[in-house]
Amino acid sequence: MQTDRHLQSAGRAPGRSINYRRRAEIFRWLHRAVILAGSLAVMLVVLSPVAWLVSSSFQNEAEIVSVPPHWIPDQPTLKNFKAIFAATGDETVTYETRNKQDPASGDYIPSTAGNLLPAMANSFIVATLVVILNLLVGIPAAYAMAKIRFYGRNGSIYFILTTRVIPDIALVVPFFLVIKNLGLLDHILSLVITYLAITVPFTVFILIQYFEGLPDELDKAARVDGCSRFQSLTRVFLPLAMPSLVAVILFAFLTSWNEFLLALMFTQTAASQTLPIVLASFTSDFTISFSFINAAGLLAIVPPVIVAIVFERYIVSGLTAGAVKG
């Protein structure tokens, strides 16, 4: 009897193991399907506004405001982009001098449209200067705090981190007083100075964690070979810190390119205004050209997208390396 039971249980064991494997495989595929569906839903929410921005940039005003909206333009046009690049010409039609046509035709542009390209140049200059100065200040500071032991080192690191706890809007008045005393109101250098105060703490924090994760033997070996502190930093540590450097470069560039509040406070004329300020000025108390604003917005996101695509493979690794010690 016992022998028969053992034979029966042995005969059922392979079937049970097959069922378990099938269940595990089904659960694995269901898990993947849920992750895929969630990823597609998030991607749809994130990319839908961008897709509409691109599509509406090639539509006229009447098609943009039509119901239901046209995700694919019926009659694609480049008129909006031509108006941007011809905004300073004799054919400019402004809110004040627009033709006696139906405003829905989109045959008018804002009176401040001629400031768009200079504002893009100002934004690029400010972002580039902030990135360069950010690296010149942040790299030596992070290296010193990570590899040189001195009194007050930990307190300095915590102080740098606490500066990012303060919201930017609380710093507007102190920044304004400093910029006014320096005589830099309505000058792009005012934005460079304030953006450095915002981005340098992040740069120092990320690079400190990365430099601390590198073994001290690298520094000692470089010193034995006759390298100074500066040579050890530039020849040994910086090449290894490239992912984190790219991450802080992107953060500084995108922050400077997109910042609105401080630029609104410190710039008044087209000579110093950046792109977000000029884009905000395209609205009027009486009417608005969605087609023109969308085309200008599409041009505004091109440089950051190009920078992000070029350095995309460094972004995640750089932020991860700076977020985890060791």
What kind of region is each of these model predictions?
Residues 1-26:
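Short, Lys/Arg-rich, polar N-terminal cytosolic tail immediately upstream
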Residues 11, 23, 32-326:
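A structural signal for multi-pass alpha-helical bundles of membrane permease subunits
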